[in-house]
């Protein structure tokens, strides 16, 4: 029994190679089935995302090259092209790597939480294909526990490091409750969709989506229960908005100073937060001159993000310490399991010797033999049988000139305590 992790990621491989070695939905099932039947593999999990492809296995000794061969052959990739980008971790290094990955410590965005969900899904997929053995099951369950501990004891995921998340975090800081706020989202691209997801997860239920093409906006409207309007309708709905987050590809500003000024008057000068994450800008810079309008540009958010990245690096130090501690503890536990079979076999052998000699002694007593003589013979034979293997080991170590081995055997037998 040995743990092995092989893979490539955004740090080691190009997008082109990552695409070739990815396990899409059509490949994952067959791959897990092949690993389940592989002679060198006891259990496996495949983690495949846009930034990494990794195979975690409980393998028999000497399976490293066999697993690398399998990966290259499965994807029909030349091994010479794969090897420079491939990393291999064994035993505790494999445990530590999985824990680091699941905690977001090996991610493109340090501390990002999405990877944990992806690892959990990978484990679930493997279990569905009966590819998980006891060691792999215990490893991943422990990893999920460690990831939870890292999130609880550190703030590695508590600081916004994406523009979309930073925009929502800023809104949360200014408005105590997003559930009471109306948010106008200008645009309907990936960034605005991500913003909407963050807003919804923080309790925001009143969203208005304004977009040039209504079809795309309707999709977001259905997904988040948002009202849908055209860009031309923004002036009519702007007074309702406590928060405006804009990200379009418009070459010219969509929201001007006069439009916001009019909206503020209709709002009786209740404050309005405008977060412009578009380049070029969607909101005229002069809007920031209005006393009740708080305008933040993508550059303002970037400075927040840069500061938060540095804070995450500080939190990562503690997270790394937790991972080191937990991976070492798990490895110790795993090694103790490896002794279970040997202990079981040793006890079985001793019991068989005892039962055999006891049976013969009882037969002797039944025929009228002297009890004292029978007991002495039993004790002598039992002693000789039980010390036979250790005696041979001591003799072999001495004859082969292996003092270190001799010392270990003496310590094991407790001879140094005599």
From Swiss-Prot:
Site (Important for activity): 97
EC numbers, comma separated: 1.2.1.70
GO molecular function: glutamyl-tRNA reductase activity; NADP binding
Gene3D superfamilies linked to this entry: Glutamyl-tRNA reductase, N-terminal domain (3.30.460.30), NAD(P)-binding Rossmann-like Domain (3.40.50.720)
Enzyme kind, highest EC tier: oxidoreductase
Pathway(s) it belongs to: Porphyrin-containing compound metabolism; protoporphyrin-IX biosynthesis; 5-aminolevulinate from L-glutamyl-tRNA(Glu): step 1/2
Record field: catalytic activity: (S)-4-amino-5-oxopentanoate + tRNA(Glu) + NADP(+) = L-glutamyl-tRNA(Glu) + NADPH + H(+)
Domain observations: Possesses an unusual extended V-shaped dimeric structure with each monomer consisting of three distinct domains arranged along a curved 'spinal' alpha-helix. The N-terminal catalytic domain specifically recognizes the glutamate moiety of the substrate. The second domain is the NADPH-binding domain, and the third C-terminal domain is responsible for dimerization.
Xref: HAMAP family: Glu_tRNA_reductase
Subunit architecture: Homodimer.
Family classification: Belongs to the glutamyl-tRNA reductase family.
Misc remark: During catalysis, the active site Cys acts as a nucleophile attacking the alpha-carbonyl group of tRNA-bound glutamate with the formation of a thioester intermediate between enzyme and glutamate, and the concomitant release of tRNA(Glu). The thioester intermediate is finally reduced by direct hydride transfer from NADPH, to form the product GSA.
The protein's name in its UniProt record: Glutamyl-tRNA reductase
Organism encoding this protein: Vibrio campbellii (strain ATCC BAA-1116)
Name of the coding gene: hemA
